[in-house]
Amino acid sequence: MTIILKPGSVPLETLEKIYREGLPVRIDPAFHAGIEKAAARIAEIAAGDAPVYGINTGFGKLASIRIAAGDVATLQRNLILSHCCGVGEPLSENIVRLIMALKLVSLGRGASGVRLEVITLIEAMLEKGVIPMIPEKGSVGASGDLAPLAHMTAAMIGEGEAFYRGERLSGAKALGKAGLKPVVLAAKEGLALINGTQTSTALALAGLFRAHRAARTALITGALSTDAAMGSDAPFHEEIHQLRGHKGQIDAGRALRTLLEGSAIRRSHLEGDQRVQDPYCIRCQPQVDGACLDILRQAARTLEIEANAVTDNPLVLSDGRAVSGGNFHAEPVAFAADQIALAVCEIGAISQRRIALLVDPSLSFGLPAFLARKPGLNSGLMIAEVTSAALMSENKQMAHPASVDSTPTSANQEDHVSMACHGARRLLQMTANLNAIIGIEALTGALGVELRKPLTTSAELAKVIAALRAKVATLEEDRYMADDLKAAAELVADGTLSGVISAGILPDLEA
């Protein structure tokens, strides 16, 4: 299946399919005429006498140096090779595929001036599985993601490296094995390919998709913990959240209420319970998780706009002029990444407190210490809770805003930058930590519910426990725990736990 992209209106749902499923993509042929028109205009400018940045001049601080017509192709090649300055491990294939798809969307708007053959090469590389090797570090998020995108482009011109069928090869070899030929870049094409926010945006989108799946699962594990602790569902009453009015809070409260519907555990203490209120980690879930959901949705709106944006420079305007601007500055992406980081941090923080509550016999309302069946002889989930605390603390450190840390570069020509790229890249580690925290809460909550037998939980939560137990057996006595934690985190990450919940209960990203 090939996804047909309509530049300017590609929805988040499609972008997530590209990220998760690695499907090939093509630009809707209806956009080809506009692409070719802009390319023809760039060719006219390159043949003329007037200096235009990036077409017949140097770059950055060297923009005042005029380039002879005969050197334009060399200029573009030199640009790519000199900007291949990335360091660190290669970005994963699914991230690079998303970067390439986003670059297609941007170029497909017909304001960049690249020839159609450049676009068709990217499409063919995605279809045949030629994935450029892009090091993870080296971008400050303005002027675009220069170093990462230069590595992408290097493979297109037969330089650099690329992965093909599991092999890491030279760019030329990878293209050759796939039956493709490198492109010779014409005027402005190198600049159009490397000057853009696609790396930062792809990383931020990946973080968003992972964070949203984790957020949905955290509502499930939060409901499990509530039932395991014999907590009250009264704070989830619809009217409470309507009176405040925040959409995320309303949606989170509704989800928690529905997940707990029909629980025999809850019915057992409706009357005669001497506890007046639950701790905040139980009672305030809608307020905390709902606020996180709201900012994830806000970040989603920003990133959907950016994914459809033209972010190189200069741009070919509708009147035919090539005009320099600053769309390459990734400040919106940096802010979105910082928002996602805050949400990831807080979802993990309140989840960790519920884990701590359930393993503490002074708080868990009758559950054994650390949920061990023979406390003392067995330590139960004692150190699983400690691990969740370590991961929570690590995420707190990584949640510091990246967008506030500008520094001047390129001889002060590029004197304010966004730091969007590493701000977005940290989300991969943060969401991995969050998946592990929520996985530990799933283990804790499920075991707590099982220890309430013969009382039973709701039908929805019973499905979650069954999905967990298909991979992780109930803890009867101490055993090697690392495999349990790994399996539980994977069930969060791959959507297994959220996937068993009936449609319409868990909140969507687009609301």
UniProtKB/Swiss-Prot annotation:
GO terms for molecular function: histidine ammonia-lyase activity. It is found in: Cytoplasm. The keyword Electron transport does not apply. Pathway: Amino-acid degradation; L-histidine degradation into L-glutamate; N-formimidoyl-L-glutamate from L-histidine: step 1/3. It comes from the Bacteria. Contains an active site 4-methylidene-imidazol-5-one (MIO), which is formed autocatalytically by cyclization and dehydration of residues Ala-Ser-Gly. InterPro entries: Aromatic_Lyase (IPR001106), Fumarase/histidase_N (IPR024083), HutH (IPR005921), L-Aspartase-like (IPR008948), Phe/His_NH3-lyase_AS (IPR022313). It is an enzyme of class 4 (lyase). Its EC number is 4.3.1.3. Belongs to the PAL/histidase family. This is Histidine ammonia-lyase. It comes from Brucella abortus (strain 2308). The lineage of its organism: Bacteria, Pseudomonadati, Pseudomonadota, Alphaproteobacteria, Hyphomicrobiales.
